[in-house]
């Protein structure tokens, strides 16, 4: 028999203080993301300091490609969770489980098709982004191993997204802790102990992601049986599949469209040489560590808005957006106090002091991006709020704005300013996206309030 709601495993975000609900949901997300980025930093440090700058460049040369493909997978799975959150907010649990059942079917198809196509075109994609010849072979091996893990990536993001749709962000955090610790241990064994190099880093990621999927399955079966479909809920439903795809595919495409701009930017940067590729890799690792707070406040807003839309509580949505913006601005001040004086020291985690050029260029990237963090924070809050309200097409258009901006930077700023042009790639993209998202959210919020009234 399927249980109904358990207060210990679910979190109703339609009641109580909006600020408290968002913080309670966001903290495990932020800690989990920081943990994940700390793993990536440790991984990059192991690769850069023990294998060499060339190996670090090999891993970095494929980063935008990974964002293109994994971004589509992760974004689609996040979109599949939106109808689940809305049905949970409306207390329609049978409908919620039917969405779960149909989203699993879609995810299996996505996993097979995306893995197959990614592996076939791996080499051609690396050539397309001007991967330096001296690191091409290592980049190819690393990327192929990442592609082999796509089914695990989709599985984890689908299941953890459904757990979070019910307001539980703690459990996926615990699973990330476990997977990250295993990943770091395997890095030590495979890279330092067995000398497998970049190949060892890829294998470690593959195994740890598989474990995270198994942990999600175990938790749902034991503690969140409210998500397990039964009887008629397991049937294929064309209408629900259509709703899931309408939410998931635009969110996936939003990440992929954004990634196309990143690929253009990285391609322009790769053409500058290996030192700049290594600097880009190091700076992106630290950047993601700091920007994860903005990202996960946004993720919290998607679930918050989804549940409150299902409960038809539009005023709480506006209150939540304002509270999130205040949180974002406070956090920006903290990042500025850390990044501006200590950016150079942070970059020395990845390379020896003798690699002065890499350190200098990477620190410059961090400082320029930091000035524009409020633009990024506003972007994530509004974009995820729009997604939670079920209008993924609008959020996808913001990704188009980012792509246009990064392509423009790649075609004009980088040839004119070289590395400094690369440093302005993200800030210009964030500003362009905000110019679209601010009026889009205001229009959508007024439109939905009229519908509810």
Which residues are covered by each model-predicted region?
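Interfacial/gating helices of multi-pass transporter permease domains
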Residues: 47-67, 133-138, 198-199, 240-247, ...
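Hydrophobic transmembrane alpha-helices of multi-pass small-molecule transporters
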Residues: 68-71, 115, 183-188, 213-217, ...
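Short runs within selected transmembrane alpha-helices of multi-pass transporters and secretion channels
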Residues: 77, 145-164, 172-180, 201-214, ...
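Residue-level signal for short hydrophobic patches within transmembrane helices
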Residues: 15, 19-38, 42, 65-72, ...
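Small-residue-rich hydrophobic transmembrane alpha-helices
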Residues: 56-116, 153-172, 279-343, 376-398
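Transmembrane helical elements of multi-pass membrane transporters/channels
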Residues: 24-43, 145, 156, 179, ...
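Helix-terminus/linker motif at the lipid-water interface of multi-pass membrane proteins
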Residues: 38-56, 126-133, 189-196, 256-289, ...
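Short alpha-helical transmembrane segments in multi-pass integral membrane proteins
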Residues: 1-26, 84-149, 193-249, 305-372, ...
